[in-house]
């Protein structure tokens, strides 16, 4: 696995992206040489490099929205190849819509774009097919040993088994408890104790050892783990691989050390200041652009009868500060007179207009005011009402380290409706975001949000 700034990224996903970049470059070169009116292709490319870079960025964005950087897909299947071809041409349409009405970007004409689009769609589909032929068998077979057959080790084993094709194949446990050695734990054998690692690793062809020990490590265990690196084997701790697999924090199996590191990281200060400036700028722009939509929504809500246009509810923000979140009212007036409760599917309290407004996410637009006031950000954990029953969730209160957002990591990775039962799981996603916060992770959330909205999946 790779870690680029704050984001865990699979090397297979990086390989897909690099392959697409090569396909795009080749498609441009092919188009320049096939275009009959082209006299000096390299000079033309140099003079219009910004235009070609912009077009390439649009292609990559559309492919991401189409979920075509999912390296677990088998692109040998005809429907997945058709999926690739469809979205490569959607990318072409997006280029035309964005740059070619009414004129053109740089000096890249429409005819040249057709040559490039045909070349790119054929190349990227061929690359995806080749990727699956070569890489699909390889990525299923990374054999691992789990050091620790206790709760943390079993927790990791369950996460791997729940994600077929994730790229990891547990071979067995290693544990220093003599009563466990030689037994079967959750269907996996305990092959020996930690002192046997130098023998077990080559014997079972193990390239990766995972230390799933939450208690204090003994001197013997520490010495055995150090020896792992001496025999050309990678050593990684359980929380890191669990984060990579699930996009969550294993709250029951981590210490408080990460939060101390977060607080002393000076780069976070500059990130938060720049993010505030971006939030402020974008909020002003979006308020201006969406003002007609806000007016129409307000009129439609008013047409259903009397009652306030906006729904205000107390939420807990950064550093525990309580604020009123602003939404368009989508329920009957007085729907929460008996106190707030979770919204269910087909909730009878939701009005006809409100149902449409919620489906299109238009009820979130007034939260631009919360962003202007500095109470929220575009991206961050969703603001929740104060609830004493949630304080028993490990690290729940750490959510207030950052500003709440309109969309967040929990919403794009766990897109089902929020209920009391799902809150602990969503908090794990929120904590992952806080621990790994950064612009790259924000960009990933933004792109995943666009994908969810485009395909109509819930938050």
What is the role of each PLM region?
Residues 84-88, 140-159, 308-331:
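Membrane-cytosol interface motif
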Residues 246-285, 309-313, 415-439:
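Glycine-rich flexible loop motifs, especially short His-Gly-Gly/GGXG/HXGH segments used as catalytic or interaction
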Residues 270-334, 370, 439, 444-459:
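A hydrophobic, helix-centered structural microdomain
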Residues 343-404, 445-449, 453:
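A short, structured surface patch at a secondary-structure boundary
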Residues 29, 34-36, 40, 131-248:
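A solvent-exposed beta-alpha-beta segment
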Residues 178-181, 242-252, 310-349, 406-430:
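Short, glycine-rich, amphipathic interfacial segments at transmembrane boundaries or analogous
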Residues 351, 373, 395-459:
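C-terminal terminal-structure detector
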Residues 1-140, 144, 168, 459:
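Signature of alpha-helical transmembrane segments in polytopic membrane proteins
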């Amino acid at each position: 696995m790779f870690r680029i700034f704050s984001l865990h990224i699979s090397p297979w996903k990086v390989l897909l992206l690099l392959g697409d970049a090569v396909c795009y470059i080749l498609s441009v070169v092919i188009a320049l040489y096939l275009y009959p009116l082209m006299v000096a292709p390299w000079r033309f490319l140099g003079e219009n490099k910004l235009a070609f870079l912009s077009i390439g960025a649009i292609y990559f964005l559309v492919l991401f929205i189409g979920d075509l950087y999912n390296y677990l897909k088998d692109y040998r299947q005809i429907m997945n190849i058709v999926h690739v071809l469809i979205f490569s041409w959607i990318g072409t349409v997006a280029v035309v819509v964005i740059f070619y009405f009414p004129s053109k970007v740089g000096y890249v004409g429409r005819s040249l774009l057709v040559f490039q689009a045909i070349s790119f769609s054929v190349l990227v589909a061929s690359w995806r097919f080749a990727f699956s032929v070569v890489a699909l068998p390889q990525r299923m077979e990374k054999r691992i040993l789990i050091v620790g057959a206790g709760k943390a080790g079993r927790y990791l084993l369950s996460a791997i088994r729940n994600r077929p094709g994730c790229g990891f194949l547990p071979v067995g446990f290693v544990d220093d408890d003599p009563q466990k050695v030689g037994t079967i734990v959750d269907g996996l054998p305990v092959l020996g104790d930690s002192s046997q690692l130098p023998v077990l690793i080559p014997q079972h062809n193990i390239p990766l050892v995972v230390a799933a020990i939450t208690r204090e490590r003994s001197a013997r265990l520490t010495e055995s783990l150090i020896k792992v690196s001496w025999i050309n084997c990678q050593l990684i701790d359980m929380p890191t691989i669990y984060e990579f697999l699930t996009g969550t924090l294993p709250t029951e199996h981590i210490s408080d050390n990460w939060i101390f590191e977060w607080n002393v990281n000076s780069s976070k200060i500059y990130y938060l200041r720049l993010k505030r400036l971006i939030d402020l700028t974008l909020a002003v722009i979006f308020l201006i652009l969406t003002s007609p939509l806000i007016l129409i929504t307000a009129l439609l809500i008013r047409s259903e009868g009397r009652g306030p246009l906006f729904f205000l509810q107390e939420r807990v923000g950064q550093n525990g500060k309580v604020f009123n979140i602003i939404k368009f009212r989508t329920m009957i007036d007085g729907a929460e007179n008996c106190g707030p409760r979770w919204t269910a599917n087909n909730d009878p309290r939701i009005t006809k207009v409100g149902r449409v407004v919620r489906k299109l996410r238009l009820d979130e637009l007034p939260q631009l005011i919360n962003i202007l006031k500095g109470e929220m950000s575009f991206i961050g954990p969703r603001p929740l009402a104060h609830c004493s029953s949630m304080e028993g969730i490990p690290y729940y209160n750490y959510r207030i380290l950052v500003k709440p957002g309109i969309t967040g990591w929990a919403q794009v990775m766990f897109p089902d409706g929020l209920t009391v039962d799902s809150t602990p799981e969503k908090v794990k996603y929120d904590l992952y975001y806080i621990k790994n916060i950064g612009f790259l992770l924000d960009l990933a959330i933004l792109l995943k949000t666009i994908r969810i909205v485009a395909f109509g999946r819930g938050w």
